[in-house]
């Protein structure tokens, strides 16, 4: 007698079709990056713009963020997976006090040679390297994030190139529309006014903390790439990068049709604002770079990004939250961190409030498009 047929059981053809759709979804970002790069090549050739990248700057900054990402991922891992990461490490140091002494001396050396933030990062990375060695983690396992990292690097270079190309051929500026929307949201006030008043009255420690929160986003993205790739698998890391790049695609398309720039670009008294010096210099550098682009100066494409609406600085952490949602403690910590980040984005005059709302929408679309076909994979131990 034949066994009963389960009407709800997936057939081989349906399984194969789902697998194909999943693969297409997973590599959608790669297809997008390749398509954008082809459009970039054709567009720059048509307009006689030399395609020249500052590769050394890209590599240097990517390496710095990569090191910071390792430190960030170790902190998140210790918080979100204490029994797997923190407890065994604590036991090892308790059983071998000499190890703690050596680590203390190494930390003292780092803090003597480098600024406090850099020293802390190097110390955390050193701890991570020692832990990987002690646990005997296979080299092949440690290479899981490599392909997603290369994928992200190529995608970001393409995005920066496309952004530079767009501001070269389009001089339109619809920021006044976004500013008007902001005036309704802020009851007649503006993002620049809010930023200047806050920075004039807040202690330097607060504005510095907000600045660190803003720039730390890049390490947060790298940490998510590392955690998803190492704990879930390389394919999950690739899916994360695809989602980020898809969000950038939406942003680039909006910017091509509706170019907007951050509030400091049109702020009359921006030079007098009491923003942190690093923030002022970064914003002034972008304004200078934009002027050169719009005057068709022959300068290499660097890590320059001009898009105000929608705000990718809020879209990306939301995507990170989605991919790290299975670790509740990490999620809780990042919700607090990203709430501070959202405040920093406006209070340091990087974006309009309306830009943040656009960023939330872009993140939602990118997540739905890139993850709705994929079954969630359970995390595993790192071996």
Show the residue positions of the predicted features.
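Membrane-interfacial catalytic/cofactor-binding modules of polytopic membrane enzymes
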Residues: 254-327
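Membrane-interfacial alpha-helical segments at the cytosolic side of multi-pass membrane proteins
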Residues: 224-228, 314-331, 361-372
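Alpha-helical transmembrane segments
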Residues: 26-42, 95-106, 151-155
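Interfacial helix-loop-helix junctions of multi-pass membrane proteins
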Residues: 262-263, 308, 340-365
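Membrane-interface loop-to-helix entry segments
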Residues: 205-220, 304-325, 353, 357
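Intramembrane catalytic core of multi-pass membrane enzymes that act on lipidic substrates
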Residues: 125-213
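Juxtamembrane "helix-exit" motif on the non-cytosolic side of transmembrane helices
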Residues: 42-55, 82-83, 106-115, 136
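Interfacial segments of alpha-helical transmembrane regions
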Residues: 144-153, 222-259, 263-272
């Amino acid at each position: 007698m034949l066994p009963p047929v389960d009407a709800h059981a997936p057939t081989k053809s349906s399984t194969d079709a789902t697998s194909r759709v999943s693969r297409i979804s997973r590599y959608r970002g790669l297809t997008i990056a390749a398509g954008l790069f082809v459009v970039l090549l054709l567009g720059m050739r048509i307009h006689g713009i030399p395609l020249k990248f500052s590769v050394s700057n890209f590599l240097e900054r990517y390496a710095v963020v990569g090191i910071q990402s390792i430190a960030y991922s170790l902190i998140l891992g210790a918080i979100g997976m204490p029994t797997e990461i923190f407890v065994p490490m604590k036991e090892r140091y308790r059983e071998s006090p000499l190890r703690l002494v050596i680590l203390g001396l190494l930390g003292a050396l780092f803090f003597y040679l480098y600024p406090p933030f850099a020293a802390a990062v190097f110390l955390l990375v050193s701890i991570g390297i020692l832990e990987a060695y002690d646990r005997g983690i296979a080299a092949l396992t440690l290479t899981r994030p490599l392909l997603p990292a290369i994928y992200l690097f190529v995608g970001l270079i393409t995005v920066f190139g496309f952004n530079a190309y767009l501001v070269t051929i389009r001089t339109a500026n619809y920021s006044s529309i976004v500013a008007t929307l902001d005036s309704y949201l802020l009851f007649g006030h503006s993002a620049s006014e809010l930023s200047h008043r806050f920075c004039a009255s807040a202690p330097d420690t607060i504005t510095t903390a907000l600045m660190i929160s803003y720039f730390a986003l890049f390490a947060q993205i790298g940490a998510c790439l590392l955690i998803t790739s190492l704990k879930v698998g390389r394919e999950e890391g690739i899916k994360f990068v695809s989602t980020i790049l898809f969000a950038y695609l939406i942003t680039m398309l909006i910017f091509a049709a509706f170019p907007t720039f951050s509030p400091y670009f049109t702020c009359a008294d921006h030079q007098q604002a009491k923003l942190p010096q690093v923030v002022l210099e970064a914003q002034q550098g972008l304004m200078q770079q934009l002027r050169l682009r719009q005057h068709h100066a022959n300068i290499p494409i660097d890590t320059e990004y001009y898009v105000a609406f929608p705000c990718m600085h809020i879209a990306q952490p939301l995507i990170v939250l989605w991919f790290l949602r299975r670790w509740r403690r990490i999620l809780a910590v990042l919700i607090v961190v990203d709430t501070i980040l959202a405040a920093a984005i406006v209070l340091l005059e990087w974006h309009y409030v309306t830009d943040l709302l656009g960023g939330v929408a872009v993140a939602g679309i990118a997540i739905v498009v890139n993850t709705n076909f994929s079954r969630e994979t359970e995390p595993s131990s790192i071996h």
